[in-house]
């Protein structure tokens, strides 16, 4: 009697399915999905467009170099975060909590731009139309930065913070057990389901015709 054929091992395939280029493609799609669905990509795109338009307006007239330097700095930082999320580079640097860095950048961007408006106002006595247009664009950019800052609150939910803590390696560079993340997610899903059932029972008790 012939010996039974050995079973194919599928565990290694599942383990390695997110490595290499296929893994990067998955991270690329998932990162861009979150980046665009949460509104950060739209805000950063508008910020970069407005900053470029403001620089063009200021370069048409005599402008203090500090104003141009400020706009160039903010444009560079915004472009850095845009390509960081678009190319999924943040997924491969897990020891940095990028939402916190992005929040600090939005706060600094709005603060510097508002300060730059007052500085540009004091730098000239006469305000030509291109100069005034650049100041208005700086104000709109600061407002959009505040909107992007408010959108960051979704990243600071307890579930995402716990996920980040579990994915962060320890001092020796070793990552935590991935089973802890699965157990935590299952527990939170069960708590959410119990909460929904309790709310449904409460509505039924208040409305007999429910």
UniProtKB/Swiss-Prot annotation:
Q: Which GO terms describe its biological process?
A: chemotaxis
The Swiss-Prot or TrEMBL record annotates one GO molecular function as: cytokine activity
Instruction: Tell me, in one coarse class, where this protein mainly resides.
Output: membrane
Keyword field: Chemotaxis, Cytokine, Membrane, Transmembrane, Transmembrane helix
Q: How does it sit in the membrane?
A: Multi-pass membrane protein
The record's subcellular location field reads: Membrane
| Domain (MARVEL) ranges | 35-157
Protein origin, superkingdom: Eukaryota
Q: Which GO terms describe its cellular component?
A: extracellular space; membrane
PROSITE patterns in the record: MARVEL (PS51225)
Q: Can you tell me where the transmembrane regions are? A: 35-55, 65-85, 103-123, 127-147
Report the sequence similarity comment from the record.
Answer: Belongs to the chemokine-like factor family.
Q: What is this protein called?
A: CKLF-like MARVEL transmembrane domain-containing protein 2B
Native species: Mus musculus
């Amino acid at each position: 009697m012939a010996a039974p054929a050995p079973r194919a091992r599928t565990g290694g395939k599942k383990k390695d399915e997110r490595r290499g280029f296929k893994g990067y493609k998955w991270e690329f799609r998932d990162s861009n999905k979150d980046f665009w669905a949460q509104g950060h990509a739209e805000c950063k795109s508008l910020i970069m467009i407005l900053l470029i338009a403001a620089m063009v307006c200021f370069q048409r007239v005599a402008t203090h170099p500090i104003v141009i330097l400020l706009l160039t700095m903010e444009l560079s930082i915004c472009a850095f975060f845009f390509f960081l999320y678009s190319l999924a580079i943040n997924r491969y640097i897990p020891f940095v909590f990028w939402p916190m860095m992005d929040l600090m950048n939005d706060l600094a961007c709005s603060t510097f731009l508002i300060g730059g408006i007052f500085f540009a106002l004091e730098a000239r006595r006469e305000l030509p139309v291109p100069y005034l247009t650049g100041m208005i664009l700086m104000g709109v950019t600061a407002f959009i930065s505040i909107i992007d800052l408010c959108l960051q609150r979704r990243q600071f939910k307890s579930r995402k913070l716990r996920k980040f803590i579990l994915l962060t390696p320890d001092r020796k560079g070793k990552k935590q057990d991935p089973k802890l993340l699965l157990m935590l997610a299952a527990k939170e899903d069960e708590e959410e389901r119990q909460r929904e059932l309790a709310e449904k029972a409460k509505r039924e008790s208040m409305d007999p015709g429910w």
